[in-house]
Amino acid sequence: MIGILKKVFDVNQRQIKRMQKTVEQIDALEPSIKPLTDEQLKGKTLEFKERLTKGETVDDLLPEAFAVVREAATRVLGMRPYGVQLMGGIALHEGNISEMKTGEGKTLTSTLPVYLNALTGKGVHVVTVNEYLAQRDASEMGQLHEFLGLTVGINLNSMSREEKQEAYAADITYSTNNELGFDYLRDNMVLYKEQCVQRPLHFAIIDEVDSILVDEARTPLIISGQAQKSTELYMFANAFVRTLENEKDYSFDVKTKNVMLTEDGITKAEKAFHIENLFDLKHVALLHHINQALRAHVVMHRDTDYVVQEGEIVIVDQFTGRLMKGRRYSEGLHQAIEAKEGVEIQNESMTLATITFQNYFRMYEKLSGMTGTAKTEEEEFRNIYNMNVIVIPTNKPIIRDDRADLIFKSMEGKFNAVVEDIVNRHKQGQPVLVGTVAIETSELISKMLTRKGVRHNILNAKNHAREADIIAEAGIKGAVTIATNMAGRGTDIKLGDDVKNVGLAVIGTERHESRRIDNQLRGRAGRQGDPGVTQFYLSMEDELMRRFGSDNMKAMMDRLGMDDSQPIESKMVSRAVESAQKRVEGNNYDARKQLLQYDDVLRQQREVIYKQRQEVMESENLRGIIEGMMKSTVERAVALHTQEEIEEDWNIKGLVDYLNTNLLQEGDVKEEELRRLAPEEMSEPIIAKLIERYNDKEKLMPEEQMREFEKVVVFRVVDTKWTEHIDAMDHLREGIHLRAYGQIDPLREYQMEGFAMFESMIASIEEEISRYIMKAEIEQNLERQEVVQGEAVHPSSDGEEAKKKPVVKGEQVGRNDLCKCGSGKKYKNCCGIGK
């Protein structure tokens, strides 16, 4: 084990040694950079850009560019980056993660690679977790970049399209991760390329990279529209679930957070809803609503998972403790919680476009990130994002005192000890930061401190508006600050001069399921070589301890006759807690990896559709593409109607009817002409006739209008079909895990079925576009926007007359009968698709 650790450590050491040599090169350039005037320093930017056009690379420019930024930072910001910050900048430029401890100046470090990569003119995105940090960094660090002649933009949620375009056109753009993802999705829903805001994704530096790429990796960004569904079922399911008793009617597994009806519960449901079998296919919706109501009542807790604010359910981010306004749980869980809390139930939504942060950020040519805590997730960063974690040494050694955990028998004993510790430290004037996992814990400690007469600030999702002010005051003498999780991350706690010698005390009220979050809390103390102390208080009733078998420990404490006020300080327990955390982290990583495997199926499909949309938007003339679609549609129709081996069984009448109804006019293609041809020869005369009709249509209107009409039709069909496909893939995903019971790998099944559904969607797109182009009359002065919304297109009269049902030769096949082609599928899912 020690050998492995040494090996890992050595890899990091080797990287540091290598970067140290580059730092020495940068230092050696200082005497030639320092004497330059401000104008000469700014002129370096133009010089670098010219050198890039002549064939030099950004790697060649690195030492000189970093030396220029260091000198500019000293002049403009009054801050001179240390050697370790230069190392952090090199690691970022190379597309890695710089692990730099709290207070080591990550924001200043980022200016070095940001400047260097912005010289290419392709744009650099600096990504933060919230708009406050984006605005702060853009205004503070923006001065430095503007001094050097680069343009800086900030991308905010409230901005208009024109303002966003300007922000993205800048050399450097500051933005939140959410806004970047949503802009990407919106860009792929617009109808004119002038409406796009983003440029191709070149280089991004993510601040607090673990928060965005690990904690939020499973959170999909969704743009949705309304799906009209009744809210009554939620009310009924909610009323029913209120009558259930734990363990008798349902079982709840604390470890997996799984809740399900027992036999008694199922019987109760069947009686309550007057049905014979709850698991009958026709009761799928009811069962789903009952399950979601159960989850709302048993798994989801008010003030921990969500809060009720102004008559709405607002989700609480489990990692940052912030309120996530505008976000909703999917699959009807949000509506179930609304029913539980008695607020207005809002309609379920239909997904129009979706992407996860994992897949969005993997589209950048180069990606890097900074954080104080990434080493525990190194495997994930390497495997999923191809980024190495490089631990950058601190500028001054860390002298913080990290004490062993104190473990109490009950929660009550633990909280009494926490409050006593806070009171004692407060009397001595030492500033204290108390970290809690849930909002309710922070409010409980707040009440206990108020009773003791200790003034304090509370920082949780309910009052995050004052976040920066509260954090700024947290290091002054006698300050007591209670923070949920890592609210306030990204803002440093600076110590008052009169407490520099004692430092900040950090008290953790329970261990988080992720070691990383605990390390972040510890890292708030002892920044830049300051003193500090950290202490975690645990109890046998904490969720992490409950989930991973603390019964034996509790029994031992009982046997030893230990009361609530006596903690045990045991290496064994600390190790058990750490191994429990590792297990949870492993489970969470597996879940994220699995999500990525599933999401990759949709990612590949999304890339195909978005690439086609882009081509359509940029193309001047779509006629060639549309003719290709018509050819495919005709070939599919011919194959479908001539698949029998015996010629007499071919359904030529059905083929002619199909062509007359969807593509041509009555009499354009005759049965007797086609009967003389082999199937592979039939397509040619049909396509020739189609092109003839297409030419006739071209003569009826100006060319510009025809080209616009083609675009309109393609956009309308592709967007409608793609939205329906996303919805269908959602449903497939929800039901696919049930296949595991049949000894089938659900992921492989999802990939195969998803691919088949995608192919079927492409065929359907081609057919519908061909039909619209050949059969629709268009109004003059048509607007692309109007038509995409379903106006201005009318089926022509000759198309109406030809609408005869395709005839199936010989024996009629019922929609639910097995298909005659021998595929083993039902007729409606095989040869009868679309009939």
From Swiss-Prot:
InterPro entries: Helicase_ATP-bd, Helicase_C-like, P-loop_NTPase, SEC_C_motif, SecA, SecA_CS, SecA_DEAD, SecA_motor_DEAD. It is a peripheral membrane protein. Residues 788-807 are annotated as: Disordered. GO terms for cellular component: cell envelope Sec protein transport complex; cytosol; plasma membrane. Zn(2+) binds at C819, C821, C830, C831. GO terms for biological process: intracellular protein transmembrane transport; protein import; protein targeting; protein transport by the Sec complex. Signal peptide: none annotated. Its cofactor is Zn(2+). CDD domains: DEXDc_SecA, SF2_C_secA. It is found in: Cell membrane; Cytoplasm. Its EC number is 7.4.2.8. It comes from the Bacteria. One of its GO terms (molecular function) is ATP binding. Transmembrane segments: none annotated. It catalyses: ATP + H2O + cellular proteinSide 1 = ADP + phosphate + cellular proteinSide 2. May bind 1 zinc ion per subunit. ATP binds at Q85, G103, E104, G105, K106, T107, D492. The keyword Ubl conjugation does not apply. Keywords: ATP-binding, Cell membrane, Cytoplasm, Membrane, Metal-binding, Nucleotide-binding, Protein transport, Translocase, Translocation, Transport, Zinc. The keyword Cell inner membrane does not apply. Coiled coil: none annotated. Monomer and homodimer. Part of the essential Sec protein translocation apparatus which comprises SecA, SecYEG and auxiliary proteins SecDF. Other proteins may also be involved. HAMAP family: SecA. Part of the Sec protein translocase complex. Interacts with the SecYEG preprotein conducting channel. Has a central role in coupling the hydrolysis of ATP to the transfer of proteins into and across the cell membrane, serving as an ATP-driven molecular motor driving the stepwise translocation of polypeptide chains across the membrane. This is Protein translocase subunit SecA. It comes from Bacillus cereus (strain ATCC 10987 / NRS 248). The gene is secA.
